[in-house]
Amino acid sequence: MNQNNISATELFQRVRELLTLPDLEPKTRNKMMHDTLILCCHEGVKDTKQAFGNLFSQVDYLCKARGIKVADKIAIQTMRRHSNSQEPLSGEDLKYDARALTLFISAVFEERIPHEVNVLIPHINRPFQKGLEINNRRIRCIVKNWDSDFIRVDIDQDADEEEYLVRLKDEENHIDHTYLWDLLKEGMQLNLLDCQVKQPIITPRLIVVEPDYLVDISSIATCFTAFGHHPLLYLLNLMKPRANTQATLLGNFAGAALDDIINSHGKYQVNETVKSNFREKALEFCTCPWFDAKKFYTDASLQAFNLQQVVDILFPHTASQAKMSAFRGESLYDRKKAILEPSFVCEALGIQGRVDLMTTDCKLLVEQKSGRNMNIETHQVDPAYHSYQLEPHYVQLLLYYGVLQHNFKLSNDRVNIRLLYSKYQPQDGLMVVAYYQKLFKEAIEYRNQLVAASFEIAKEGFEHTLNEFTPEVLNVAGTQDFFYNKYLKPQIETITNPLHDLSPLEEAYFCRMMTFVLREQMISKVGAQEGTNTSSSDLWTMPLTEKKDAGNIYTDLHIIRKEQSCAGSGYDTITLSVPDQGKDF
């Protein structure tokens, strides 16, 4: 069958055959369903000029683009998972999956389901198994004690019970928080998210340890390496000297170029970005070792060219481009609503970060990467995710997505997320990815582990952890391939070997200094005494009256003027009216 000329009629016929041919092996039937789904997705996304992480993200994208109902979308993704398996399906499951596939084909091709197929499939969805009934989105609590099944807590809400029990495991709803056994301490604060409360038992989908201790999202993502993600990797990365390489300078340029392209309204000049970027980063350019100016300019021009194409795809500025996007069923994003590098704090998840590009209506979220992606260059998918995106970049994007969800109370299908590898043309580099809940939870679990480790070291002293900073301990995945031994392990040893060659006096000094730094960092994040105005968590923990008394906030401000410092830039200067803030402010 010619994939380039596939029709809905042919795909419907394949569905009819997988339901009616009597001699098909179960695994052959599943593969036939899977191949039909692939053909349908190929037809749906072939003109989008975007790359897709895997079949999961293609299905997710097309369901959003075609306005498929949430219940049907769940059924379609269930069918996709079943088709990936060689396990035989029951006759009932096969019919429900065939129904989901038929609905998907109908939506993608915008054609009615033929009668001869319609009579073979159920007219309603598979009975939905009701999951956890969420009746409280967020509960702050303090740990009293715990056992293998429950954490006993005092909650920071009006409540009838003096003590609540937080369930650690619920197999029916695929909830497992038992990794917390090794992290919990009496007096530890927790955020319980997406909870079912049946007094006195709380069953949360997500638990965040010491949420006032904000961790930078990019720092978490960097720790997802080919050799695993040990909690001490976070501290190891903090010990590394700040990188100043041609690659980091190119990444900074690419971010500036995206900003200029968005705000240039079709009149972009790459040389202007090069000049302004050099003015802002003159010291870094001058001190960058082995800097190759000619190669930098060539690479920068390629990045800018690719970014211009990406912006035209995401924000069509001509009627013909907009019409083509609408014809493909894609969401249209408003360039006027685009904002670059907005910063967020998320007390719910205990993380903070700066998004590369999003729209103010939260319909679009883009994370940009300027470096190489060998999966794209070799056309080999990551076996863990069957996709081309790199794991740390996927983690970073999912955490930003989680911030938007929890800060703005957004549903799962509200935000469209993209990974942008700007070294490559949009058909390879502008990658549509889907929300992967398992990896998101793994990232939050890792965040909890590194926070607990930081608290423990700050309390007990760095000397108790010093001997754990070795490649053998940090390599939790047991990786021993050529790339690890040739490149990654020597990078680790550059930091860890000097730690084990210290004299007793040097070791005592270094451990005392690290303990002091970690304690100061902890105080700056969570504070040492309430009301002293010393920590970043005062932003959400300090009452308004105390903020006013401390001169920590202006209220009732109004924007009276906005200005551009130069043509082609966004509005970067605003004038505010400041009413009287009260006596002794």
What are the functions of these language-model segments?
Residues 112-139:
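Short boundary/loop segments of OB/S1/cold-shock single-stranded nucleic-acid-binding domains
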Residues 31-35, 249, 253, 395-403:
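Short amphipathic alpha-helical face segments that pack within enzyme cores
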Residues 130-140, 161, 167-288:
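Charged, glycine-rich intrinsically disordered N-terminal tails and low-complexity linkers that flank
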Residues 134-198, 526-585:
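Conserved ASCE P-loop ATPase motor domains encompassing nucleic-acid-directed helicases/translocases
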Residues 1-113:
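Amphipathic alpha-helical interface elements
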Residues 153-185, 333-448:
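Mg2+/Mn2+-dependent nuclease catalytic core
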Residues 1, 126-127, 382-388, 416-420, ...:
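Helicase P-loop NTPase motor core of nucleic-acid translocases
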Residues 257-340, 508, 515, 521-525, ...:
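A non-catalytic, helix-rich entry segment at domain boundaries
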